[in-house]
Amino acid sequence: LSFWLIPLSITNIPRVIRNKNLKIFLGSVSNKMSNAAVANITTALKILHKLEWDFQIPKDVNTNTWYIAMSNHQSWADIFILLAAGHKKIPLLKFFMKKELQWIPIIYLVHKTVDMPFLKRHSKAQIEANPELKKVDYETAKKAAKRFSRNPATAFSFAEGTRFTPKKHAAQDSPYSNLLKPKIGALAIALSGMPQVNTLIDFTVVYSSEKRSTWDFLCGDLNKAKVFAKT
């Protein structure tokens, strides 16, 4: 991944030039580089961890269409597994991520070079105290959706807004057995700014292991997983 950040960053320098056709071209190049990075990392993980990932993706999707997508969220590994699941089947997933994650250099660079937005998640109490906060997130997501419209993309958000844990599930008193209460604000905004979209892809990630940490993923403990998708 670090190797691909260098050419991605160089490719995106000319984006400061206000030329629509140039931005479309550079966006296409960035997406191709990102897909190549996903393929390379998947191959490396297959060699290192003997992956047993089963991806069940609808046959009626393609890489030349715009989509909105969502999924359950259990681990940091979800992000890469979903990227691998969608590779060469749908356009590159564009994740809406928590703004706090922008302080991690590699995440910041990846998101900026492939037009993935950071959103500040405000609590209901914060928005009630300051309604302007809702407008800030709305404008950020709307700008991202506008950029997505340049090239085929899959605007993606974890419906729960955070990773599932038994503790969070109990605290929310969620009506769902294996899900937290959904938060679909980012997807709703993205949809309003992407008139090309007419299909929602609903992903479900299932792991064989009870382990969920990033370290577990790197050690190969999440090498058995299934991804189901439906439209």
Positions of PLM-derived features:
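Short, flexible/disordered intra-domain loops and linkers
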Residues: 126-136, 170-177
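Alpha-helical bilayer-embedded segments of polytopic membrane proteins, i.e.
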Residues: 1-4
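A cross-family acyltransferase "interaction/gating" segment
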Residues: 102-122, 149-231
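Catalytic core of membrane glycerolipid acyltransferases/transacylases, capturing the structured
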Residues: 9-37, 63-130
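A Trp-anchored, charged/polar loop motif used as the substrate-binding/catalytic surface
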Residues: 133-146
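Structural element of the ATP-grasp superfamily
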Residues: 42-45, 82, 111, 190
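Short, flexible loop segments at the rims of nucleotide/cofactor-binding pockets, characterized by
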Residues: 45-48, 95, 131-136
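A short, well-structured juxtamembrane/interface segment
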Residues: 40-67
